[in-house]
Amino acid sequence: DVVGMNCFRGPETMMPYLKEIRKVLKCHVAALPVNFRTNENNPTFFNLLDRNGCTCNTPHTTTFPTALDPMQCNRYEIGKFAKEAYELGINYLGVCCGANPMLIREVAESVGLKVPASKYRENMSRHFMYGTHSRVPKHMKNYGDKA
């Protein structure tokens, strides 16, 4: 048997409930948040508001269902969530609405797995401004905090 949460809530607003579930249940627990930055004021992705300066007309009063793009979590937020959930003993992990292959790879790698898609992880050591590789010219690295 598996008990858990799927959909509606993003990582930030799902985690408190998962902690409570884990305290009282010893069975398998699942966690599949939506890939959106829900918060205390907007705990589900159905009522997220875009407060980042969108001035265009949208057909709804909230970003759901067709204007959620700027509300998405990044890979590091999903990775942090997956690692924290895994450390709580939650081992049925994933991402619901808004998921993509990169995020699923991030979930897997955050709990120590190497999956076939791991070969596509970016190699930042060769990035033209932020790389550490000896072949990245110093004058390019100097642009990192100015570009």
Q: Which residues does each PLM region occupy?
A:
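Domain-level signal for soluble alpha/beta catalytic cores
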Residues: 1-147
